C-alpha cells in the first residue's frame, strides 16, 4: 500500500465529503488526502467501482428507469453495465497517470477487456493507495445543502442513510465533491403513443442479457455504441432486430454488420407507436414489435443537491460550472468531478481532482466568481455558434481542451501515443464494428506506449 506524507499545513486542511467511489470519486479521494485533507467517501454500493460494479439483478427497477416513484428521485440500480460489455478503448490509454491498466495473468488480458477487468483495476487502485479506509459503503446520500454561514465560512450539511439499518446520519463538511457519474438516469425520447403502448418497453439501463428477447421482434432505438453492441448481440437470439437511428448515414462498420445479418434492419426515427403493436417510422415504413429497447443515453441528475437554484440541470447542461468543475457562486467548497463526456476519462478525472485538492489547500486559486461566470457564458456562446445542442454541452471530444485543463495544476499533457491510440481505436470501430476489439493494426503505437515512462516507471 502506498502512503503519503503531506506538506499541507493543518490550518489549510479541510474536512471533505466525496460522493461516489467510482473512477472519479476514488482518484478525488486520493488527491484530496495527498493535500492533507480529511476525506470521507460515501458510496451507495457495497464495493468500489461506480458504474463498473456490475449489478445483474434489475427486477426491482422500473423497465424505463423512471425514478419518479422512488425515494428522493433515486434509482434502485446504479449501474447500467450489461453482461457482455467490453471496453471501447484499449486498456493502455485508460489508466491513471501513475497506475497503468496492466494485463494480469489469470485475469482478462485482452486489450479491450470485459467490464469486470476494469472493476478489478479500480479495486487494485483503491487497495494500492489505501483508499478503502476512507469509504463508507452501503450509504446513500439524501441531502446536500449549505449550512448557515458563520464568520463568512461556508460549510455543507450532508445527510445520508445506511442501506441496511436505515440509520440516518447528518454531518458538517467544509467541502463536498460530487462524483456520482452520469450513466444511470435514462434519457428517454418523446414519441407519440409511447405512454399508451401496451407491449414491452425498456431502457438499456436495465438490459443485461439477450435471452429474454429470444424469438422476439425488437426495435432498438439509438445508434450509439451501446445501441450497436446490443443490436449485434440480439441478432443471435431475436427473430428480427430493427435499429432506429437519427440518420441513415451510417458507418461502414455498421453497414458490414447489417449486410451480414439478414434479421438486422436499419430504419429512420420513429413517428408513432400504435395500440396494435405497430411501430411506425418517419418514412412510413412500419413493423409490429414485441419490445422496444431504448439505447438513448443518460441524463445528469443530482437529486440530493439543494443549491437554491445556483446549480441547475437544463436539458443536460449542468451549470453554471467553471471548466465543468466549479460552480462560481459556490466554489471552491462545492465541486464536480466527471461531468465531461467523450474524452479519455481517467486522466481527466485525475487532473480535476488535483485541481480541486490544490484549490482547497490554498496552493491554487480560482478567478473571481464574476470572471468564472463570464468564462462560462463565453463557453456557452461558443457551443451555440458551433451548432452544438444544449444537451451535448459537456461532450468535449477535444485533446486540446484536456491539455489546457491540465495546465491549471501542472498536470502532464496527454501523451501523443495515448491520443493516437484513442483515435486508432475509434477509426477501427468505424470500419470494423464487429471485430475492432480483437483485430487491430496499431502495433507500432502499442509498442511506443509500452516503452513509455507511464509503463516502464511503474514496472521498475
Curated annotation (Swiss-Prot):
UniProt cross-references to Pfam families, sorted A to Z: FMO-like (PF00743)
Ligand binding (NADP(+)): 222-227
Cofactor: FAD
Keywords: FAD, Flavoprotein, Monooxygenase, NADP, Oxidoreductase
InterPro entries linked to this entry: FAD/NAD-bd_sf, Flavin_mOase, Flavin_mOase-like, FMO-like
Annotated binding of FAD, by residue: 20-25
Top-level class of the enzyme under EC nomenclature: oxidoreductase
A GO molecular-function annotation: NADP binding
EC number(s) recorded for this UniProt protein: 1.8.-.-
Similarity field: Belongs to the FMO family.
PANTHER family documented for this protein: DIMETHYLANILINE MONOOXYGENASE
Main function: Catalyzes the conversion of methylthioalkyl glucosinolates of any chain length into methylsulfinylalkyl glucosinolates.
Official protein name in the record: Flavin-containing monooxygenase FMO GS-OX-like 9
Organism of derivation: Arabidopsis thaliana (Mouse-ear cress)
Amino acid at each position: 500500500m502506498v502512503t503519503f506524507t503531506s506538506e499541507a499545513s493543518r490550518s489549510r486542511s479541510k474536512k471533505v465529503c466525496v460522493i461516489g467511489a467510482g473512477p472519479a470519486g476514488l482518484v478525488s479521494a486520493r488527491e484530496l488526502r495527498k493535500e492533507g485533507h480529511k476525506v470521507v467517501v460515501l458510496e451507495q454500493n457495497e464495493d468500489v467501482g461506480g458504474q463498473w460494479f456490475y449489478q445483474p439483478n434489475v427486477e426491482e427497477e422500473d423497465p424505463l428507469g423512471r425514478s419518479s416513484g422512488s425515494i428522493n428521485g433515486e434509482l434502485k440500480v446504479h449501474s447500467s453495465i450489461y453482461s457482455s460489455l467490453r471496453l471501447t478503448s484499449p486498456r493502455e490509454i485508460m489508466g491513471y497517470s501513475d497506475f497503468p491498466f496492466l494485463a494480469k495473468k489469470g485475469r482478462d488480458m485482452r486489450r479491450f477487456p470485459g467490464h469486470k477487468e476494469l472493476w478489478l483495476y479500480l479495486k487494485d487502485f483503491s487497495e494500492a493507495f489505501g483508499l478503502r479506509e476512507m469509504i463508507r459503503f452501503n450509504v446513500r446520500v439524501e441531502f446536500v445543502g449549505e449550512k448557515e454561514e458563520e464568520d463568512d465560512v461556508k460549510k455543507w450539511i450532508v445527510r445520508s442513510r445506511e442501506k441496511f439499518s436505515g440509520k440516518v446520519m447528518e454531518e458538517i463538511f467544509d467541502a463536498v465533491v460530487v462524483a456520482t457519474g452520469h450513466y444511470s438516469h435514462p434519457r428517454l425520447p418523446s414519441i407519440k403513443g409511447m405512454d399508451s403502448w401496451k407491449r414491452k418497453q425498456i431502457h438499456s439501463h436495465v438490459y443485461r442479457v439477450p435471452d429474454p428477447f429470444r424469438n422476439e421482434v425488437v426495435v432498438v432505438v439509438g445508434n450509439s455504441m451501446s445501441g450497436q453492441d446490443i443490436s449485434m448481440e440480439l441478432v443471435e437470439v431475436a427473430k428480427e432486430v430493427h435499429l432506429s437511428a437519427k440518420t441513415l448515414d451510417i458507418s461502414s462498420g455498421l453497414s458490414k454488420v447489417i449486410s451480414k445479418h439478414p434479421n438486422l434492419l436499419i430504419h429512420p426515427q420513429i413517428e408513432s407507436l400504435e395500440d396494435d403493436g405497430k411501430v411506425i417510422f418517419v418514412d412510413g415504413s412500419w413493423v409490429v414489435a414485441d419490445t422496444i429497447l431504448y439505447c438513448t443515453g443518460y441524463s445528469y441528475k443530482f437529486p440530493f443537491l439543494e443549491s437554491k437554484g445556483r446549480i441547475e440541470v437544463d436539458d443536460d447542461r449542468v451549470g453554471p460550472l467553471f471548466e465543468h468543475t466549479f460552480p462560481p457562486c459556490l466554489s471552491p467548497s462545492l465541486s464536480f468531478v466527471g461531468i465531461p463526456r467523450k474524452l479519455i476519462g481517467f486522466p481527466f478525472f485525475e487532473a480535476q481532482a488535483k485541481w480541486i485538492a490544490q484549490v482547497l489547500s490554498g496552493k491554487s486559486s480560482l478567478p473571481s466568481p464574476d470572471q468564472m461566470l463570464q468564462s462560462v457564458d463565453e463557453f456557452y456562446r461558443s457551443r451555440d455558434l458551433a451548432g452544438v445542442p444544449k444537451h451535448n454541452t459537456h461532450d468535449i471530444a477535444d485533446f486540446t481542451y484536456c491539455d489546457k485543463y491540465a495546465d491549471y495544476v501542472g498536470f502532464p499533457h496527454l501523451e501523443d501515443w495515448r491520443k493516437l491510440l484513442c483515435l486508432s481505436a475509434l477509426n477501427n470501430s468505424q470500419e470494423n464494428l464487429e471485430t475492432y476489439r480483437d483485430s487491430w493494426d496499431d502495433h507500432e503505437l502499442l509498442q511506443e506506449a509500452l516503452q513509455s515512462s507511464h509503463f516502464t516507471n511503474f514496472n521498475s
